[in-house]
Every structure is written in structure tokens, then in C-alpha cells.
Amino acid sequence: MTHQTMFKRYAIYFVPKGELAKFGRAWLGWDCHKGQYISSENAFSEPLADREYFTKKPRKYGLHATLKAPFRLQTTQNEPALRSAFHGFCNHQKPAASGNLTLSERGGFISLRPQTQSAALFELGKNCLEAFDPFRASLDQNDLNRRRNARLSPRQNDFLHQWGYPYVLQEFQFHITLSSRLSILQREKIIPALKNLLAHELDCPFIIAHLALVGEDRNGQFHILEEANLSG
């Protein structure tokens, strides 16, 4: 029996809730729960007013952190089985604490990162990577070539071939991307403004207590398909 789907790739994300989620919808301009664009005209003042330009690259994903990078389904797998496996996985995983979030800049991108990449966070990432790999189709040559252009280290290149993504296991760094690649001048203006805007969220303990299964539609936009608490 063939299961038809409107999604070309799937991923496992942490998608924030509450005030951080509200900020993310306005800042990135995409609501991955409702599957719709969000107009943020006049929502941000300088130096954040040009947020549509600042956030062009991460917009289609919605505010998120990646636990299992986007993948195409194996021909022997289907979406209902993936949905079921997602809930089974979450039922056996414990929440992961990792200190407060902090604004960070790496490679020209602004992101939110935990103050410490805790052992619990590493373990959750590893478990997620391994649990859903049986659903992942192998990368085609175009995917491999595109990733190789990112100047991967030998270990990252090995991970790319084994896991379909270079930034896993020892290379895994939990982060919530907030911008496209920006100039030094742009980052110097934006980061202090974002720190002020997100002061409350940065002052609260950060715990990953739920995950989301997301799907990428034919236009490249990501939608939440399932959410579940980590209840192990």
C-alpha cells in the first residue's frame, strides 16, 4: 500500500513555546504551527526594523533547533510509521536541561545557544539521530556535493556519509538560529537590541521538555506535524 504525502522531507526539531515562540513567529515571519506567513510590518524598530532581510535564510524553518536534520523518507517507510515512531521515542526520553540561553554569533549567524552543551543535551541529540535514521533515505549526489562545498572537516565528512548530516555526535551544537549570515556591523547593531528584547527569556532556565516532528512542503516551508512531551 502506497501512502501519499505532501511533504518532501521530514525532521525532528525543538520548537519553543510561550513568549519565545511568539517572538519567533514575528521575527522570522513564519508560523510553522499554522503554516502561514506572519506580517511583521512596523513590529520592530531600529536597528531591527529590517528583520525581513536579516531573517531570509532561516524563515522557512520557523523558530527551531535541529535534533534530526531534514531527510527524505526511505522508500520502505511511510509517514504514518514515522509519526508513530516519533511518539514512541518521546515517551522514552527524559527532558534535557542545559543552563540559560545566551545570544551567540558564529560564522556570521546569530543564534540562541545554551550556556553549556550539557551531557543530557548531547544524549538527547545522539538518541534522536540514531532512532530516526532507519527512516532516512541516503543522500543523492547533489546533496553530497552541496554539503562538501561547506568545507567540512574529515570527521564532518565522515558523519555526512554515515548519518546524512555533518553536525552530529561530537560535532553537534544545540542552537536556535535567528538570522541569515550578517556583516560584523549588522551583528554589532542587532545583538544588543535582541538581548534587550529577549531579556526575560535569557534570564530563565532552559529545558527541552518537548519535541516536534516537522515536514517540508513542496515550496520549502516547514510545518509542525506532531508535537509530544518528553515523558521518559
Label every PLM stretch briefly.
Residues 204-205, 211-213:
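Interaction-mediating elements
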